[in-house]
Amino acid sequence: MKTGLTVLIAGGGIGGLTLGVALRRAGIAFKIFERAPALLRVGAGISMQSNAMLAFRTLGVDTAVAAAGQEIQGGAILNPRGEEISSMPVSKASAEVGAPMITIHRGRLQDVLHQIVGDDNLVLGAKVEGFRDGPDGLFVRLADGREFQGDLLVGADGLRSAVRAQLLKEPSPRYSGYTSWRGVCDVSEGVRRDYTSESWGPGMRFGVVPIGEGQTYWFATATAPEGGVDHPDARTELLQRFSGWHAPIPQLIENTPSSAIMRTDIHDRVPIRQWVQGRAVLLGDAAHPMTPNMGQGGCQAVEDAVVLARCLSLEAELPAALARYQAVRVERANDFVAGSYRIGQIGQWENAFACWVREKLMRMMSSDRVDARTRRNLQFTPL
C-alpha cells in the first residue's frame, strides 16, 4: 500500500519521530507536525528497554541509539537508608532476549531519530488543532489556520492529544495521586555508570539513572493533591523532603539548579480498545498514556511506530492495515498501562506498617532469575 500514500503525523516526540523513521525505511511518504518552534535538547532521561531496542533494530537504528546513551547492567529498589530491597537482573534479561537496556537523554534520542527523518519531512511551530475526514479527503488543520491534505492522520500528540479529543468524548486524564520532579545533572560521584536505582519511602520515591556523557537523570515522586505549586526554590524544598535519605540523593538535588527542576503531576487514562476511526489512528501516549513506573511509556510508543509502519507496508487496503495495527497492539500496551498504575499505587503507600510489610514482601520475592512475565515484556516481534 506504499504507492501514493501520504501519512500526516501530529507530534514530533519519540513516537512520532520513530514512526517517521519507520515510514522512511518503508518508502512511505509522511509529514510530521510538531508544535515546538525547534527540536531542542530539552526534557530529562528516558529508558529504552530491550523490547524498544529490538524494535529499533528492525529499523537499523539500535546501534546509534546505544552509542548516544548508557547501557545498563543492573538495578535495584532500595529503602531510604540505601539498603537493597529488591534487585533487577537487567544483564541476564538483556542476554536472554538479545538486546540491551539503554538509558539516554530524551534530547539525544530525539537527535538520532531527527537525523534520519530529515528536515524536509518536519514542520515546526505547527500545532495540530483538528481534522476533517470526509468524501473530499482527509485534511489536518493547524492552529495558525493552515491545512494539509493526506491519506492517514496519526495522532502521536501525547497525553492531551487534540486528535484523540476529536475522536473520543471522554473525561480528563486520570490523576495518579502523586506528583513528580525531574532533573539532569553532571554529578557522577556515587552513581554507578551501568546501574539504576529507585528508593522507596513512605509516600515518596527517588530514582537515579545514569544516561551517558557523564550525566545523571534523577526523578522524585510524592503523594500530593493535583495542581500543587512548588516554592520558588524547588531545590531547597526537595532537599527538605528527602532530608536523611542516602547518598547520592542529596548531592544530585544540590547540584541541579531550581530552574532546571521540572515538576509534573502524574496522569494516565483508563485503557481503551479503539484507537482507530476512519482515516485517523492513535499512537503512543495519545493511545495509551501510562504512568512511568515500568519505564515503558516511550518503549511502547516505539513498538507502536514499528508495527504501524509494518502494517501499512503489508496490507493492500488502509482499513485492513489499521485494523491489524490495533489488533496487534491494544492488549499489550494496555497491560503496561494497568501494570504501571498498580506499581505506582503500591510505591506511594504512606502508612508505616504497610511500608514495612511492602519491604518484607519485596525482599522475599527478590530474585536474580528472569521470570516469564519479565521476559515477555522485554521481547518484541513486529507482527
Curated annotation (Swiss-Prot):
Cofactor: FAD
UniProt binding sites for FAD: 15, 47, 128, 285, 295-299
Superkingdom as given in the UniProt entry: Bacteria
Phenotypic consequence of gene deletion: Mutant accumulates aurachin D and aurachin C and does not produce aurachin B and aurachin A.
E.C. designation(s): 1.14.13.222
An MF annotation (GO) of this entry: FAD binding
Keywords: FAD, Flavoprotein, Monooxygenase, NAD, NADP, Oxidoreductase
Role description: Catalyzes the initial step in the conversion of aurachin C to aurachin B. Catalyzes the epoxidation of the C(2)-C(3) double bond of aurachin C, which is followed by a semipinacol rearrangement, causing migration of the farnesyl group from C(3) to C(4). Accepts both NADH and NADPH, but has a preference for NADH.
Name this polypeptide is given: Aurachin C monooxygenase/isomerase
Species for this entry: Stigmatella aurantiaca
